[in-house]
Amino acid sequence: MATVLSSPRAPAFSFSLRAAPATTVAMTRGASSRLRAQATYNVKLITPEGEVELQVPDDVYILDYAEEEGIDLPYSCRAGSCSSCAGKVVSGSLDQSDQSFLDDSQVADGWVLTCVAYPTSDVVIETHKEDDLIS
């Protein structure tokens, strides 16, 4: 004798074909497998060789993106536990919650470790500042 199991009906979904706004939003799948909107910010790096501007996604470390663009920035640990990649924020904001080297007062004073810093707004950073930080 065969048993037939019935499944509940799938919920109904509706959608609209209204025109989307002219802005572009990239959707990415994060570590949690949930989709999220990805913002991109203008990051200006003031290096000893001059200024460079990059459009950095909010989920990419500034150092990593600079390297992808062929910009040579100092680094050592790539984990936020040393000062090799130290910079100074001139304006803007970022998330460097993965770092463990800087104390709260240094972060409040605008120090940044570019190897573990994500932009959260347009930002200007003076790079190559390790000597200033540790002196």
Curated annotation (Swiss-Prot):
Origin superkingdom: Eukaryota
Identification of the protein by name: Ferredoxin-5, chloroplastic
Sequence similarity: Belongs to the 2Fe2S plant-type ferredoxin family.
Cofactors, names only: [2Fe-2S] cluster
Cofactor-binding details, from the entry: Binds 1 [2Fe-2S] cluster.
Keyword Plastid in record: yes
GO annotation, biological process: electron transport chain; response to light stimulus
PANTHER family for this protein: FERREDOXIN, FERREDOXIN-2, CHLOROPLASTIC
Organism: Zea mays
Binding residues for [2Fe-2S] cluster: 77, 82, 85, 115
Transit peptide: 1-38
UniProt cross-references to NCBIfam families, sorted A to Z: fdx_plant
CDD domains the UniProt entry points to: fer2
Residue ranges annotated for the 2Fe-2S ferredoxin-type domain, each copy included: 41-131
Pfam families: Fer2
GO cellular component terms, A-Z: chloroplast stroma
Lineage per the UniProt record: Eukaryota, Viridiplantae, Streptophyta, Embryophyta, Tracheophyta
